[in-house]
Structure formats: C-alpha cells, structure tokens
Curated annotation (Swiss-Prot):
Protein name as it appears in the record: Eukaryotic translation initiation factor 3 subunit C
Biased composition (Acidic residues): 17-54, 66-75
GO cellular component terms listed in the entry, alphabetical order: cytoplasmic stress granule; eukaryotic 43S preinitiation complex; eukaryotic 48S preinitiation complex; eukaryotic translation initiation factor 3 complex; eukaryotic translation initiation factor 3 complex, eIF3e; eukaryotic translation initiation factor 3 complex, eIF3m; multi-eIF complex
Domain PCI intervals: 600-774
Family statement drawn from the similarity comment of this UniProt entry: Belongs to the eIF-3 subunit C family.
UniProt-listed InterPro entries: EIF3C, EIF3C_N_dom, PCI_dom, WH-like_DNA-bd_sf, WH_DNA-bd_sf
Superkingdom of this protein's organism: Eukaryota
Comp. bias regions, Basic and acidic residues: 55-65
Region (Disordered): 1-81, 813-862
Bias-annotated ranges (Gly residues): 818-862
Length: 862
C-alpha cells in the first residue's frame, strides 16, 4: 500500500517526472507558437501542478491509519492523467461542441471550434499518430459541408448573413485542411467501423523545423542575395519565391488581410506587381489585376487624404486598361458580378473548348470608381493653377476607358441578356453621357476622335458605332435614346435632363423647352435624389440662357427667376457652399454637401447668369413701372423683387458714382431707360465686359440694343399717353430709330393686349388715343378694396384647410335654399373652377363658408 501511495502521490515518482519533462519539452519546442497556444500550455501545466499538490503533499500529511481515507486516496490516484490523455479529452470535448453546433446549423461556432481542433491535434501529432476521432470528425464535417452546399443550391434552406459568413470561412478551411489527411479520410469512408476498431494508427511524419539563431537570421538574407541584386526575405530569413503556382495563394492572403489594421498596402501592391511578372495564364493575370486595382483604391479609404494620389490613380487606370486588353483577347474569360469564386488555390480552373469561365468582379464598378476619384481630385485642386489643367487632361484617359468598358459590357449583354448585365450597360452609358452633355460640339468632336484612335481597330460599339463618331448631336441622341428604352427611374430622368441641357447649350430652345414640358420632371423632381435635383437646376438655367441668346426676354426671365430669384444660385447649382452664421447644418451634412460640388470646369458663370437675369428683368420691369404710374390697379404687380430691391437701393443713394461692377451697370442702364434716354441705356449696357464671355458677343450686343429701342418705345408710350390726343408714327420712328413697320407692329401688339387705350389711324399714319378709359379715384379704391378682400378670403380658406387637415367636406352645406344637408347628402356643388349653376351661382370652395351677402359680395364674385 505504501508503494502505491508514493507512486501515485509522490512528487519524485517516475510517472510524474516523465509527465513534467514531456510538458517542458513541449513548451521548449513551441516557443514561437501563438499566444493562445502558449496560454493553453500554461493552463495545462498549472492543472497538473495542482493535481500533483493534491495527490502529493496533502496525502502525505494525512493519517495513514485510517482505512477509509486510504481508499479515497486510491480513488484519486486513478483520476491522474498524462498530458497526452488530457489532450485527447480536450479533443473529444471540441468534437462534441462541433457536433452540437452542426445540429443547430451554427457555422460561426463550427468555424471557431474547427480552428481550435486543428491547434489541439497539432500538439498530439508531435509525439504520436493522428487520432482516429479527429479523422472521423473532419471527414464527417466535410460531408456536412457538402450537404449544406447542396441544400443551398436547391433552395431548400437559406442561411442568414452571419451563418453564411461563418459557413464560407469554414468551408474553405475544411477543404484546405482535409487535403493533408486525404489517405486516412479515404480509408475511413471505405469502412468506417473497421477503421475505428483497428488498433494501428498511421502517423504523419512531422519534420521539426530547425531553430534559427539570431546570427543565422541576420546572415540568411545575405546568403539569399544574388550577384545581380536583392531578394525579398520573409520571416525566419526565408527568401520569398513568386511562382505561377503560388499566385493564387498570395492573392488569398492579400484578400483575407483586406480591411485589417496595420496592413501595409504598398507592400501588397509591390507583391502583386511581381506576381504580374510571373503570371502565365489569362486567368492568373485577370485575378491579379482585379485584386491590384481594388488594393490601389483601398489606399484612399485608409489614408487621411481627401482624394486618391495622382500617381496611384494613373497606375490604377493603366491596370484597368490592361485588364480590359486581357479580357478582349480572351473572350472565354468573363468578369461578372454574380460569378462564384474559385476556392482551390492549389490548381487553376480548366476550360473546355466552347465553355466560358466566369470570374467574380465588376468592370463597371472600377470605371465608376476611377471617375469618382478623378472628380474628387478636381474638387480639391485650386482651379486657377496649372495643376488643375494638368489633372483635367486625365479626363481623356478616363473617357477612353469608359468607351472601352461600354464596348465590353455590350458584348456580354448581346451574348446573354440578363437584368444585371443590362444594368451594367446602363450605368456605363450614363457615365459616358455625363462626360459629354455639358461640352460644346467642337470639344466633343476632338475627344471622340482621340478616343477612337487610341482604341484597337477591331473594337466597336453597337450603341455608338465608330463610323458615326463625327456627328456629335447623333452621339448624344443615341446615348439618351438607349437609356430611354432600357432604363428607368433616376437613370432615365438624368438622361432626359442631359439631353435637354445639350440642346439648350446648342441654341435649340424650343426643342429643349418641349422636352422639359413633356417629361413632367418639374412636377416630380422633388422625389429624386439631390444630385438629380442639382442637374435639374443646371438644365433649367441653361434653358433660360438659351432663351436669352435667342432674344426671348420674357421666357428667359420667367425661367431664371426660380433659381436666381432665391439668391442661392451657388447652393442650387452645387458651385459653392453658403456658410450662414446661425446654421444648424451638422458636420456630416456639410461633408456630404461638399462631396456634391461640381468641378470648376463644369460651372456656369454666376456673374454672367446674374447679369442676364437682371437685364431680362430690366426689360420687363421698366415698362411695367411706367404703365403703373397711370394705372393704380396695377401698382401691386411686381415681376422681379430682386431687381426692384436693387433699383430702390440705388435711387436712395445721395451720390451715385460710375458703375463699378456688372450689377451697377445694369441698374444704371435701367435708370437711363426709365428716363427715356435709350441711347445712353444701350451704351451703358453694351459697355459691360461680361458679354464677351458669351458666344458671338457682337450678335448679343446687337440684340440688346434692339430690345432697348423697343422697350424704350413702350416706356415712352406708357408715360406720355395721357398727354397726347394723337401721335405720328413717323415722329416715333425718328425718335427711336426704328422702322415705321416695326413701330406699327409694337403698337398693335400693345393695343391687342389691352396695354394701351388707342387705335391706329392708317390713313394719317398716326396713333389716336382714347380718353376717359382711365379709372377714377373712387373706382381705383373700389378695385383695391376688392383685391384685398379676395386675398383675405383666400388666406382664411388656406388657414382653415391647414387646421382641418384637408377635411373640406365637413364644412360644405347644401346648395338648396335654406336646406342643411348632412354628410353624404346629395349636393350639386362643385369645386373651384367647376361649372356654374343656373342663376350664376358657382360651387362652394372646399374648406370654408361661402361669402355671399351684399353688393360688395356681388362685386367680388363678378
């Protein structure tokens, strides 16, 4: 009994010492293992020491005379296990956790426990063969993975996001891990019961890696250096070898490290550049290019820079162009967003004749990212420097890539037409359209010629053929019509706006106006995103500028008033941010606002825009002010509040000097025109230098002079009509230097619009004014009172509708004499604008009580 006592509990026993030596030897062999493994070793060592203490010193101090205590001590002796047995127990526990996770389909736990299982079996195989329970576990786990894949493809069971992520990670690791145990797994699957009952276990030979001392680590790189240059050295002094067989493995490591901290992106880029040199097959080059371009874009997301570095952008553009060249020369390799990823890094996929290999990736996304990065850099570069001009020249490279990408995705869509492929074509066509719609025809012609010359001669596009590249209008029309036919939503609306902008830019006012009206974008533009609303504002402004160049002053002022009348032209056109003192804009909103700003070369000249708006307002406001001086009922009518406010401010000045800017020049010209001196007004307006920025400035100035003559005539007639009985047309012709035919046409138009109470005497070639048509003072006051009453009534109705939240029917009464109809009773009343009832009664307006008493009420109704 005493020998057994000392054998089981003594700290100096052979068994205990051998266990201790085994643990210490294990710890020495695994000095450079992971922290998690070392912590597990420490836990095991501490557990053994605790068990030794319990079975050693404490037992030795107990009373040996007690038989019951001796029996308990003997039972405790049987619990003591060696390190190998403990590791096997841990292995079994881990396998049980995996089996439980398989029952509930918890792939996150399976992935974690599988990694732990491999670490545990690595320790066991260092001193013995591979456990059969491990072979059974990994073989069953691989079968379970295959079953899950089959269920996924058949659609019987779908995994959620977290399960799918864990499943993909576990599937790759299991497949890669089981290659090392292929023979044992095959034996297990042939006869599972015989394999588990047999006693022989095959041991996988493990060659211990020789320890490398610090001196050897220092000398190893030197030994790897050739006479020609340097060699890349990895961990442990090993020289990294880049071979065609290792390309996919290197790419796998780079992809898995994406998004992690402390990752050297530049080193990864250099690695992939070396992989390109050793790549032999098209598949290898395509895979490397896809990863390389994505890594270059990641440099911007991980740095503090606002935009991508110019050298990296150009490198990414060259890689993208090379990728397209490889794809064009190898039509059996297709980059497609929905393709499945190739998981076997040991070998490459083989393509049978007539088959197509689909590689996961997106050509259109790369083109869009290049476009976005170029735009972002142009936003942050000072536009008044040579750097901006140099950077803008890169747009030619980008446009060439867009045309090339369009031709590539067109070919894919023609082979097999699907919604994702059609969407890719729409996106790249939209990007191309956004690069040409705002440019003059001459610039587009030069850009198209240079693009097609740089592309391979066999490359062509079915949407915009190479042969028709010289016709700019046909180019824009073809791109827009394609998007009208095959796209919808935002892309279709943006294509419509781009076409309208292009037509207005090239002086086709009526076509652009009709397209804008027929598209109904004015009614639902608020439902689109902010970028589309900005494009809508730009298009609206361009239509107004086109109307002004065509001499359509009223149309120009009416179109520009919505944008220019608000005083927020910069913000509405995305050409600058207005910082207000008490602004409640958050930093995130301000950042988004800055991202929406357009590059400088796409800007519309705001000073020219303001000058055109004020000039158009002057031509309408000055005759109107002269007309209202003798017509009190029209005093409340204002066409442009902005122009009126500027004119009033200028008139309040005691001393007015010569005009110093464009705005002062227009206001001074308006004062001369109101005073009847049209020659000085024309001279002052034509002296503004900003007209030289418009195409054909001489034609514009001639049009302005003619408009001043006509509006000067109208102003003169409005001002002095009460003092004339008749006026000779010949006198007016000499006064305003207009032909008598032109003057007769202007006066006839004024008479037909009831602006002038007169008649043309064609016999005497004169104007005969009618007297007594002006309103008396009492009549003017009655009209003013009626106008105010109507405005008050409308304001009350609007307030009532807001408070009742549109419940207009609750306040309508029966139209019968003295009858009160309940809700739902038959009534003949109509809404505002409906047909009148017999006797002159009109339907009640919804939402309020009808005003219907007295002579004043009758006057208002009339």
């Amino acid at each position: 009994m005493s020998s057994r006592f000392f054998y089981g509990g003594g700290s100096d026993s052979d068994s205990s010492s051998s266990d201790e030596e085994e643990l210490y030897s294990d710890r020495e062999e695994e000095e450079k293992s992971e922290e998690e493994e070392s912590s597990e070793e420490e836990d095991e060592t501490s557990e053994e020491e605790e068990s030794d203490e319990e079975t050693g010193a404490r037992k030795f101090l107990k009373d040996v005379a007690s038989d019951s205590e001796e029996e308990e001590e003997e039972e405790k002796v049987t619990v003591v296990k060696s390190a190998k047995d403990k590791r096997l127990d841990e292995l079994e526990n881990t396998i049980k956790l995996i089996e439980n996770a398989k029952k509930i389909n918890d792939w996150a736990v399976i992935s974690t426990e599988f990694d732990k299982l491999n670490r545990q079996v690595a320790k066991i195989t260092q001193s013995g063969p591979t456990p059969k329970i491990y072979i059974k576990a990994v073989a069953d786990l691989e079968d379970f993975v295959n079953e899950t894949v089959a269920k996924q493809k058949s659609g019987d069971k779908k995994l959620n996001a977290s399960q799918a992520k864990g499943f993909n990670a576990a599937k790759q690791r299991i497949k890669k891990n089981n290659k090392d145990y292929g023979n044992l797994i095959d034996k297990y699957r042939k006869d599972k019961e015989d394999f588990m009952e047999s006693d022989d276990e095959e041991a996988i030979p493990v060659i211990a890696a020789p320890r490398i001392t610090k001196l050897e680590r220092i000398e190893a790189p030197a030994a790897a250096i050739d006479d020609d240059g340097f060699a890349t050295v990895g961990r442990g002094g090993k020289t990294l070898q880049y071979t065609p067989e290792s390309i996919l493995k290197h790419l796998r490591v780079i992809v898995e490290s994406r998004g992690k901290k402390n990752t050297d992106r530049m080193e990864q880029i250099r690695t992939m550049e070396k992989l390109l040199e050793v790549a032999q097959t098209p598949y290898q080059r395509i895979r490397v290019y896809l990863t390389l371009i994505s890594t270059r874009f990641d440099l911007t997301s991980t740095s503090s820079a606002n935009y991508m570095a110019v050298d990296q952008w150009k490198s990414a553009e060259q890689d993208f162009s090379s990728l397209l060249s490889v794809l064009e020369n190898n039509r059996d390799h297709v980059v497609f967003e929905g393709a499945e990823e190739w998981e076997d890094d040991e070998k490459q996929p083989t393509i049978a004749p007539g088959e197509t290999l689909y590689i996961p990736g997106s050509i259109v996304s790369f083109a869009e990212r290049l476009d976005d990065e170029l735009t972002r850099s142009l936003q942050h570069i000072d536009p008044h420097t040579a750097e901006y001009i140099e950077r803008l020249s890169d747009e030619k490279l980008l446009y060439t890539d867009l045309v090339r990408a369009q031709a590539y995705v067109e070919g894919l869509n023609e082979v097999e037409k699907t919604d994702p492929r059609q969407d890719s074509v729409n996106r790249v066509v939209m990007r191309r359209l956004e690069h040409v719609y705002f440019k003059p025809s001459q610039v587009i012609t030069i850009l198209e010629d240079a693009t097609w010359k740089s592309l391979p001669s066999e490359l062509d596009s079915s949407i915009t053929p190479r042969a028709s590249s010289g016709n700019v209008e046909n180019l824009v029309l073809s791109l827009c019509n394609y998007l009208f036919k095959y796209s919808d939503g935002i892309i279709r609306a943006r294509a419509m706006l781009c076409q309208i902008y292009f037509l207005a830019l090239h002086d086709q006012y009526y076509r652009s106006r009709d397209l804008m009206l027929m598209s109904h974008l004015t009614e639902n533009i608020s439902n689109f995103d902010v970028s589309t609303q900005i494009l809508f504002n730009r298009t609206l402004v361009q239509i107004g500028l086109c109307a002004f160049r065509s001499g359509l002053i009223y149309e120009a002022q009416n179109t520009l008033s919505e944008v220019c009348g608000s005083g927020r032209q910069k913000e509405l056109l995305a050409q600058g941010i207005i910082m207000q003192r008490y602004s409640t804009v958050s930093p995130e909103q301000e950042r988004l606002e800055r991202q929406r700003q357009l590059p400088f070369h796409m800007h519309i000249n705001l000073e020219l825009l303001e000058c055109i708006y004020l000039t158009s307002s002057m031509f309408l406001e000055v005759p109107l002010m002269a007309q209202t001086s003798s017509s009190p009922e029209m005093k409340r009518r204002v066409i442009s509040k902005t122009f009126r406010r500027m004119l009033d401010y200028n008139e309040r000045q005691v001393f007015t000097g010569p005009p110093e800017n464009t705005r002062d020049g227009v206001i001074m010209s308006a004062k001369f025109l109101a005073a009847g001196d049209w020659k000085k007004a024309a001279e002052m307006l034509n002296s503004i230098k900003i007209w030289d920025l418009m195409p054909q400035p001489d034609k514009i100035k001639e049009m302005l002079s003619q408009q001043i003559q006509e509006e000067g005539l109208r102003t003169y007639l409005f001002t002095y009509a009460p003092f004339y009985d008749s006026l000779s047309i010949a006198t007016l012709s000499n006064m305003f230097e207009l032909s008598e035919k032109k003057i007769s046409a202007i006066i006839s138009r004024m008479i037909s619009h009831e602006e002038l109470a007169a008649a043309l005497d064609q016999v005497n070639n004169a104007i005969v004014f009618r007297k007594g048509v002006e309103l008396s003072r009492l009549q003017s006051q009655i009209v003013t009172l009626a106008d105010k009453s109507m405005n008050l009534l409308e304001a009350n109705e609007k307030t009532l509708e807001q408070r009742t939240q549109g419940m207009a029917n609750a306040f309508q009464r029966d139209q019968g004499a003295g009858a009160r109809g309940g809700r739902g009773s038959g009534r003949g009343g109509q809404a505002r604008g409906g047909p009148r009832f017999p006797g002159g009664q009109q339907g009640r307006r919804p939402g309020g009580q009808q005003f219907g008493g007295g002579a004043l009420g009758g006057a208002i109704k009339a």
